[in-house]
Structure formats: C-alpha cells, structure tokens
Curated annotation (Swiss-Prot):
Residues bearing attached sugar chains per UniProt: 43, 84, 303, 347, 364, 377, 439, 524, 551
Entry's localization field: Lysosome
Protein name as it appears in the record: Beta-hexosaminidase subunit B2
List of catalytic residues: 357
Main EC class the enzyme belongs to: hydrolase
Chemical reaction(s) catalysed: Hydrolysis of terminal non-reducing N-acetyl-D-hexosamine residues in N-acetyl-beta-D-hexosaminides
Residues in the signal sequence: 1-19
Domain of life assignment: Eukaryota
UniProt EC number: 3.2.1.52
Disulfide cross-links: none
Gene: hexb2
Family (UniProt): Belongs to the glycosyl hydrolase 20 family.
Organism encoding this protein: Dictyostelium discoideum (Social amoeba)
Physiological role: Responsible for the degradation of GM2 gangliosides, and a variety of other molecules containing terminal N-acetyl hexosamines.
C-alpha cells in the first residue's frame, strides 16, 4: 500500500507541474494518513470525469490536481493570514477581504490536537501587471496536524487571490460546536487555468448599471475565477462614457444621471485590478453608432432616416453606422481610441472595436458617401467598411494595443473580391458557429469563443447544462490550439437591468467559468458538476450575489440551499 501511495505522490508531482518547486513543501506535510480507497483515489486523479464522486472535492471551478485525506483540522480563534509580500496593497486587501468573508462567526477553541493557527501566503513575483497570460497558478498545502500551518504558494498576487477563493470553499463552520474547520486534510492542490482569457461580456448601453452594481459584478466574476470583464460600454442605444476630448458625446446617454464619469471609469478599473480582473473596453465601430450622432450629427450618414432600408425602430434597434466618408467620423473615432487607451485610463492591452453588423443599407441614400467612394476608388460598401476598419486597427496597433473584433471583420476581409487581408494582430471573437474557429486558427488568428448558442445568456432557453457541455476547442487541430485564447459568455441587456442581472448571468456563467478553467475530457459531465455547482451557488448567495437556482428563475418550494 505504501509503494502504491508513493507512486501516486511521484506521479502527482511530476505530471503537469505548474512551475513552482514544491518538494520541500511536500516533505513538511504528513502524507501517510491520506486515505487511498478507491473512491477518494479516483477523486485525486487529474483526469476528472462524470463517474467521479464530488463529495470530497467540493470546489468550483475544479482544481487541476488535488490530493486529500480524511482528517479534520480545526482552526484557531486566533488564526491569521501572513505573507512574504508585505508591501503589496493588492494582496493585503485580498487577505483582509477573505478573512472577513470566511470568519463571520465567533468561534471557540477546540481541544483536538489538529489546530491550524496560520496560513502563509508566499508570492514569488512583485509584478502586479494585468495583461493577457498573467500567471494565476497557485498551490495549497494544509497539514493534517495543523502544526506546520498551511501555505498558499503563487507566482503572482493574482494566483494567491485565486488560491484564497479555493480556500474559502474549503473552510466550514460547525454551528453546534462553534468552531471553524477544514475537512479531508491533508490537502495538496496544484492549480492553474486552462485558458488565459476567461470572461463575461456585459452590455451597459441598452440598460445602465451603476458603478456599485458593476463592482459587485466584477466581484462575482472573481469568485468564479474569471479574469476578464468585457465592458460593452456603448451601442446605438446610448453612449454613457464620458470623454474629455469630445464632451458632447454623452448627449447620447439615456440621461444625465446615467453616465460614467472619468472618475467612475478609473474606480471600476482599479476595483477590477484588486480582484485580478482585466477590463476590456469595447467601443463598437463603424456600426451601432446612432448614439454618437446625438451630440455630433455629422458622424451619421446624411438622409439615413429617409432611406427605407435604414428605418430601424429606436431604441430597440437603431443600428445606424458611422458615415465613413465624414472626416468628423475619423477624428472622433480615432480620438476616442487614443483617449481611452491612454496610460491614465485603460492599461489593458486588448481593446475591442466591434466591427459587427454594419448596416450598409443606411449608406444607400447618402450622396456624400457615394461621391466619396468614387473619389477614393472604392467599389462597394464592404470595401468602404474595410477602409474604416483598417484605420481603426492601425490606430490601436500604433497605440500598442491588440485589436479585438467580432467575427464579421474576419468574414468581411475574407469575402469574395476583397484583396485586403485582416491584419494578423487582430483577435477574432466568434459569436455564431463555433466551428468557425477551425478557419480562424487555420489562418493564424488568435480566437475567442462566444457562440450565441450556448454563450448568449439573453437566450432564456439556454440552461447551465448546455453551457457546461459546450467544448470550445472542438475540431481545432492540436497544433493550433495555442491560438484559442479562451472565450466569453455574453449578457446583452435589452431585457436585463440591475433588478435581474445576477439571476440572468448566474448560475449559467458558472458553467463557462469551469469549462474555461478546468479541462474536462468527458463533456457530458453535468452529473459530476451539479452537486458542486449547487454548493457554489450557496456560497455566492452568502456573499450577496443573487444567483438563480440551477433550473429555474425562482425557488420551487421551501428548502435549504445546501441540502436542496
């Protein structure tokens, strides 16, 4: 039996290492007491499947590698977090935050011998830069005696934050005996994400969300170990972002109370940073630009309202594009890109410029656009759109940013008769057929998956099981998988506002979070996921996040959250 266990430990250490030396830490942990009966041994495997029991490893999203035992360690009333990175305000805030989230009750001392007094958070790097591919790996070690304390080891503060979230889910309170405890010790967890880009898109144009709601939304993303808030800030319906360069642009907001000031924007970005969340701003262009024209009418096509094909009801659609023949369109569009990509604003390297659903019919009735096309030797409206998009892409590249665009741009540049190639720097975000990723990766483009089925959460017929069963890498050649950066689930806000946002997004986004974090070979594994998902929902309810029940918009009957 000992030989079998030693082999298991060696396999665990050697296989799929996340780059942190752990041999010294393992030697400090008493492993001889770990149970290796069939069920728990199966749970220790790195190849999780639907046949596994999730009674022991009740963590969401599932960690990459786990070893655990059957001993309960009790937590001292004087427990504390300590760290080697004492100068990091980000880590200090995270430690304080999780301490308050975990220890909400008064606890008593326990007479048992297994007492945990401290967890050391050891971080290798002081670099707190948030960019695509930042290191989120972490390791957790909890002794079965408590004598040696516990450890969270990470390359960056953001890995430590992910580890603290896992620890939160491991600690429980015994209300009868009045003490905190960690069951199934000792624990060894080695974890790192499957994809570097794991996000949720939220549309704040169709309905406005306050800064406090957006901050709470960002917190919910971090609890799920997402790392991107894709902020679809503006659209045809409203332009709520304050611009110091073009102050009249917010005339396109719903009202003077529904505007994000420069201070608001910076506050949201800073809050996200403290939770390890990148904020990727999207300003869609040249389509969906009606709101731009409220303050600057010259950027919209002349006589568009008289064009039968362009008569779209507002505010439900209003998909009026920019006038790509207007100098003002370029001045404002390029100026906004420069302003919102400044060092004092969005430091994020990805910037989304949309490029989707350009309504060419709105250009039909504009003599100015037709004359401009003749002068520029532009033969089609598709070429006119490409002319504009190239300018926007080049502007972002010059600013040192990575352009992100919806799949329409990839399809436009690849359409018949178009000789211009989509610049290789562009990241393509797919929102129709996910198999389009076979083509985008074949052509060398970095790709994000956001197929409307099942990643569009405004579709009420999509349940969490359908989201969970979707495999973003299906069909992509193994050699091109590196080009699949991950994906985003999307919440369009036509029928959603602050009153129902969290119930609409969660728990379905939970499923996306795990599939983008943890590699599951057997995609039909909802049975394996459901008990953990139900428990994780309870954790979010405890933290004030109004996640809906798994299969309904409201509870079916009186019941316990944890036992339902």
């Amino acid at each position: 039996m000992k030989l079998k266990f030693i082999f298991l430990i060696l396999f665990f250490i050697i296989g799929n290492s996340i780059g942190i030396k752990i041999s010294k830490e393992i030697n400090k942990i008493k492993l001889n007491d770990i149970s290796i009966d069939g069920e728990i041994l199966l749970n220790k495997s790195s190849d999780s499947s639907s046949s596994q029991s999730s009674k022991i490893i009740n963590i969401w999203p599932m960690p990459k590698k786990v070893l655990n035992g059957d001993i309960t360690v009790y937590i001292s009333p004087h427990f504390q977090f300590t760290t080697n990175l004492t100068k990091s305000t980000t880590l200090k805030k995270a430690m304080d935050r999780y301490y308050k989230l975990i220890f909400t009750e008064d606890s008593k001392s326990h007479s048992g011998i297994s007492i945990l007094n401290e967890i050391k958070i050891l971080v290798k790097s002081e670099d707190e830069t948030l960019q695509i591919g930042f290191d989120e790996s972490y390791e957790i070690y909890i002794d079965d005696s408590g004598d040696d304390g516990g450890k969270i080891i990470a390359e960056t503060v953001y890995g430590a934050i992910r580890g603290l979230e896992t620890l939160y889910q491991m600690i429980g309170f015994d209300y009868q005996r009045e003490y905190y405890q960690i069951k199934h010790c000792p624990w060894i967890i080695q974890d790192s994400p499957r994809y570097p880009h794991r996000g949720v898109m939220l549309d704040t144009s169709r309905h406005f969300y306050s800064v406090d709601v957006l901050k709470e939304f960002i917190e919910a993303l971090a609890y799920n170990k997402f790392n991107v808030f894709h902020w679809h800030a503006v659209d045809s319906q409203s332009f709520p972002l304050t611009s110091t360069t073009f102050p009249k642009i917010t005339k396109g907001s719903w009202s003077s109370q529904e505007i994000y000031s420069t201070r608001d924007i910076k506050e949201i970005i800073q809050h996200a940073k403290e939770y390890g969340i990148r904020v990727e701003l999207e300003i869609d262009m040249p389509g969906h630009a009606y709101s731009w024209g409220i303050g600057y009418p010259s950027v919209l096509p002349a006589n568009f309202s008289h064009s039968i094909q362009c008569q779209q009801p507002c505010p439900t659609e209003c998909n009026i594009p920019l006038d790509v023949s207007s100098k003002e369109s370029y001045v404002i569009a390029m100026g906004l890109l420069e302003e919102f990509n400044g060092a004092s604003m969005f430091n994020e390297s990805f910037f989304h410029i949309g490029g989707d659903e350009v309504a060419y019919s709105c250009w039909n009735n504009s003599l100015r656009i037709v004359d401009w096309m003749k002068r520029e030797n532009i033969s089609s409206f598709q070429d006119a759109a490409i002319f504009f998009e190239i300018k926007a892409i080049e502007q972002l590249i010059q600013l040192g940013k990575t352009p992100v665009m919806w799949e329409d741009a990839y399809l436009l540049f690849g359409s018949s008769g178009i000789t211009e190639k989509l610049p290789e720097e562009v990241v393509v975000q797919i929102y129709h057929d996910p198999l389009l990723a076979l083509n985008t990766t074949r052509d060398g483009y970095k790709t994000l998956q956001s197929p409307y089925w099942p990643y569009y959460l405004d579709n009420p017929s999509v349940d969490w099981e359908k989201v969970y069963e979707f495999e973003p890498s299906n069909g992509i050649h193994e050699k091109r998988l590196r080009l699949l950066l991950g994906g985003e689930t999307c919440m369009w806000s036509e029928l959603v506002d602050a009153s129902n946002l969290f119930a609409k997004v969660f728990p379905r986004a939970f499923a996306t979070a795990e599939r983008l974090w943890f590699s599951i070979e057997n995609s039909n594994s909802t049975t394996f996921a459901k008990p953990r998902l139900e428990r994780f929902r309870c954790f979010l309810l405890e933290r004030g996040i109004g996640a809906a029940p798994l299969n309904s918009t409201s509870p079916d009957d009186p019941n316990s959250c944890y036992s339902s």
